[in-house]
Structures are given as C-alpha cells and as structure tokens.
C-alpha cells in the first residue's frame, strides 16, 4: 500500500507543480493554478497516509519514487525521452529510496 500512496502522491505533486509551470513559464491561463493547488493538497494528504513513524524517512523514501515519476512525466506528458544519464541517476535514487524504505528497523 505504501508504494501506491507514494506513486499517487508523486503524480499529484508533479501535476500541481506543472500547473504553476504552465501558468508561469508557458503563459497559460491563471485558471491552471486552481486544480494545481488542489493537486498539491492531495499530494500532502497522500504522503501523510504512508505508514511510518518518522516523516523525514517517508519523505526521503518518497524522493526515489518522485524522480522516477518525474522522468515518466517528462516522456509521456512533455514528449522528451529521458537519456541514459537521466535513467542512471533515477536508478541510483530508486536504489537509495528502496534501502531507506525496506531496511529492517528496530533490530
């Protein structure tokens, strides 16, 4: 369930941030901001649902999922294919996030 929350949170955060990007950098209508802010609220709520006793650990583990989702967004929404350096960097981050998320604790 944790991965589901992280993935949904990443999509909500990226969509929310992209709405600001679209308004500011792509000169889209300010109406883009309303669903963006709702999306950012959804992001925060979803991340708070992660089952952990330390917020910082949840955020650190989330980072790897966020990077992978950002590269998927880059490719699927923006039409820019990630290069080998993007993919290598994402692999390192996902490995680190997995270590944080799956490490045996309390031993």
Swiss-Prot record:
Signal peptide: none annotated. The keyword Cell inner membrane applies. Keywords: Cell inner membrane, Cell membrane, Membrane, Transmembrane, Transmembrane helix. It is a multi-pass membrane protein. Pfam families: UPF0060. One of its GO terms (cellular component) is plasma membrane. InterPro entries: UPF0060. The chain crosses the membrane at residues 4-24, 30-50, 60-80, 87-107. It is found in: Cell inner membrane. The keyword Transcription regulation does not apply. Belongs to the UPF0060 family. This is UPF0060 membrane protein mll7841.
